[in-house]
Amino acid sequence: LLSALGYNAIRLYTEDTYEVEGEPYFGYLRGRYSGAELKEMDAYAAARGIELIPCIQTLAHLGTIFRYAEYAPIRDIEDILLVGEERTYRLIDNMFRSLAENFTSRLVNIGMDEAFWLGRGKYQTINGAEKSESIMKRHLERVLEIAAKYGFTCEMWGDMFMRAAYGEVYEHTYDHAEEVKKKVPGNVRLICWDYYHTCLLYTSP
């Protein structure tokens, strides 16, 4: 149907719901896609002229992995990975290795949205207080290095950088766009998503 409608790409959103080699508790009992299933979906899409693009999470939205002691050392707070901990980057490397094996696309969305409490848990205990924006940027640079190692080009959700510039809920004027652009590495594309401006407060003249 999507092919008939003219679509040439589709994004498959996952959190811990895909199989990662070397990480048996990642997606354990969560109905995760196996590598074989991902390859089958990828081939099915490709046969119809559609690129299947993985959307993963490399910072937040990973709360269910922290049910297991294996991942306790890399939990910052809530559903957020501990930035700067090498085990965090081994996990992310394993993620990308699995993506490279199971997808033909070399475009990936690395997530990184809604990490509201970034740096306020174990990270702060270890390193002291630091602005989340600087933690975010440092983590992003590491993730981009890993992605490049496997030949991936990255896009990500832009809300964390936008919130840093605009406040708790960023404005629709985008008058800080250049400021945001300067803070983001040139080899990643920000995608703006917005649940907020559908409410009366932001639609009224």
Which residues does each predicted region cover?
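Short beta->alpha connector loops
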Residues: 194-198
